[in-house]
Design a protein with these regions (language model features):
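Core SAM-dependent methyltransferase catalytic element
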Residues: 68-77
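Amphipathic, hydrophobic secondary-structure cores in small proteins
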Residues: 8-61
Length: 79
């Protein structure tokens, strides 16, 4: 298992989810990805995407204007 970070600050919906999907496709099951964003839509969009694709949201935090969503990649990394 390794940890990775994806910076989507400044991107608006749907780009944070698209970039998350692209990055997850390069990771292995068990890897952790922290997505950092400024678009408040990620609070709903990334957890919804994770549910559909079988990944786990581990933590969601807010730091000033930034939102961080940590997820664990499960199953096939092609999702």
């Amino acid at each position: 298992m390794s940890e990775h970070q994806l910076d989507t600050r400044g991107l608006l919906c749907p780009m944070p989810v698209i970039r998350t999907q692209q990055r997850v496709a390069t990771l292995s099951p068990g890897d952790i990805l922290e997505v950092v964003a400024t678009d408040p839509g990620v609070l709903h969009d990334i957890p919804a995407w994770c549910r559909v694709h079988g990944h786990d949201v581990l933590e969601t935090t807010r730091r000033d204007r930034e939102i961080a969503v940590r997820l664990r990649v499960n199953g096939s990394s092609s999702a």
